[in-house]
Structure formats: C-alpha cells, structure tokens
A protein has these predicted regions:
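Flexible, glycine/threonine-enriched loop-and-boundary segments that flank and lead into catalytic domains
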Residues: 28-31, 168, 172-237
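Short coil/turn segments at secondary-structure boundaries
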Residues: 59-61, 133, 149-154, 183-194, ...
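Short, flexible loop/turn elements at secondary-structure junctions
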Residues: 1-2, 29, 50-52, 143, ...
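Signature of N6-adenine DNA methyltransferases within the class I
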Residues: 1-129, 146-147, 160-164, 222, ...
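Short, conserved charged micro-motifs
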Residues: 162-165, 245-250, 287
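Short Ser/Thr-interspersed hydrophobic loop/turn segments at strand-loop and sheet-helix junctions
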Residues: 138, 179, 203-221, 243-265
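Structural beta-strand/beta-sheet cores of well-ordered domains, especially the beta-sheet scaffolds
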Residues: 41-44, 58, 135-137, 149-151, ...
Length: 287
C-alpha cells in the first residue's frame, strides 16, 4: 500500500525534495508462501537511490498475480510506479470540476452485528411487533455484487418506550452497548450511551447510486445500482445522492476504471474506492 493512494501521494514530494529516484520496481504481485494456511499477500519491490546517474530505469509488470514478471524500460518511475516524470494527483477537498455531485460513504454501525438482521434471523425479528416497525433493507457491497439480502434495525426515530418494551430491541441494544464499551476508540466508547444509533450516520434522503468500495480488478467496470432512501447505505458502500445520468455513464466507463486502477488503493489486488473527492477528476483516491 506504500505505492498506492495517499501513501504514494505523500511519498512523491519527499523523494523529489531529497533527490531520491526509483531505479527499478516490481508492480503488485502475489507473494508465494509454503505455509498451508498462508494468507494472500500482495506486494511490490522498489529499489531507489540518492542522486542516481542517467540511464534507463527498469519496471516489471505482472499479467497474472502469480505469473512471471514482464520487464519494460522506463525513463523515470514515480511513486505510483508509473513511467512518467509527473507526480501523482494532488489531494483535494473538493472536485476540480465545479458542479460534480458529492460522493459519501455509507453509515457505520460498529455493533458486532447486533443492529443487523440476516435472512435467517428475519422471521424472528419480524415477529416482534415493535422491532418489526424499525426493520429496513441494509445494503453493503455484497448486496450489489452478490444480491445479498440483509436488513438493519434503523432506530433513528425510535422512542425510549419502544426500545425498552421490545425484547428483541432490548437484548440487541444491550449487546451493542457492551461491544462499544470495550472499544479502544474514544468516540466508539462514548457511543455506548446511544446503542440504538449507528456510530457514523450518513443516510441519503432521496434516491442514490450505490457504489461498492471494494470490487474485483478483473471487472471492466465497477457494478453499481440505484436505490431508494428506504434502503440504508452501509459503510462498505460509497453513494451519490440524486446522481445525474451523465455521471453514472462516466462511472461505468473505461476511463473511470483505469483511473481507480492507477490511483486508488487496493484490498489485496481488488479496487478500493474512497469518497474523499481527492482526485483531480472525481472522488476516488484515498484508501
């Protein structure tokens, strides 16, 4: 991840200021291990030097994660491991192009699953007449990529009486409170006092475009889906509220896919989109 996203963006000016240059680099490949239960580890190899002399740089690419490297000559390699003298895109707090709609990250429950309802749990929760009124469809990346069906207990407008009188709600909220009390994060620990609320609330109030934050690098484009405000956006999704048709068309283009392939981060080798709007064209840069 050092040569991806914000890390590469931060490293590039340091290299330039100290007259260091990358002499050779192996782009992302899967590290082989003899362990039977070894985790899938993706890595890069980078060699650099202070004030190197002239001459070609060496860049190694991999058509397959476990394949053999393919070498190409490069004039200069930047911190995104691209053959160019140009730096990566600068971090921005707003889009470079005026009028682009904002991309946001969905809501985060921090609940150890107690505010979420799986398909096999639905009938039990729905049988509680109070809890049933707070059931809402819950969408994460799996809902878009794999058609996963899941719900959440959306209790933003709930009453204290409902939370106390419902056996389902009382049990689940007590578990949420205990989970948050054990967190080392001060804001999560403080949220134990309001276990019925997600720790991060970012729910659209009108129709929204759901964008999985993680997606296979083998896809031509990232699958997306338009949903209504009755569906709760989870934190594994990014979303654009009232997304214009032309923006959707761009997000489904090869240009957008190439952009995130080059400048976004990765989870193993999969794309990882962040809605920090830090790229010069659109929103997809930091991981």
């Amino acid at each position: 991840s050092l040569m991806q996203g914000d890390s590469a963006r931060a490293l590039d000016p340091i290299f330039r200021a100290t007259a260091n240059e990358i002499l050779f680099a192996h782009r992302s490949f899967q590290w082989d291990t003899e362990a039977s239960d070894g985790a899938a580890v993706y890595c890069v190899i980078v060699g650099f030097s202070f004030a190197p002399g002239p001459g070609a740089r060496r860049l190694f690419d991999y058509d397959k994660a476990k394949g053999d490297p393919r070498e190409q000559a490069a004039r200069r390699i930047n911190c995104y491991l691209i053959d160019t003298e140009l730096p990566g895109p600068a971090k921005r707090s707003t889009p470079l192009l005026a009028g682009l709609p904002a991309m946001s990250k969905g809501s985060q429950p921090t609940d150890k699953g107690n505010l979420l309802v799986k398909l096999e749990q639905y009938d039990e929760v729905a049988a509680d007449p109070i809890a049933a009124t707070y059931l809402a469809p819950w969408a994460q990346s799996a809902a878009i990529l794999d058609n996963e069906k899941k719900w959440c207990l959306w209790l933003v407008d709930s009453t204290a009486q409902d939370r106390e009188e419902s056996p389902i709600l009382a049990k689940r909220l007590a578990a949420v409170a205990e989970t948050r009390k054990e967190s080392p994060t001060p804001s999560v620990k403080a949220a134990a006092r309001t276990p019925w609320l997600f720790t991060q609330l970012r729910q659209p109030t009108s129709r929204w475009l759901a964008i999985p934050r993680h997606s296979s690098e083998h896809r031509i484009c990232v699958p997306m889906m338009e949903l209504g405000p009755e569906t709760i956006a989870g934190d594994a999704l990014a979303y654009i509220e009232n997304c214009p048709a032309w923006v959707f068309v761009y997000l489904q283009s090869a240009a957008f896919t190439d952009w995130i392939r080059t400048f976004s981060g990765a989870l193993e080798s999969r794309f990882r989109i962040s809605p920090d709007r830090s790229s010069p064209v659109t929103w997809c840069s930091d991981r």
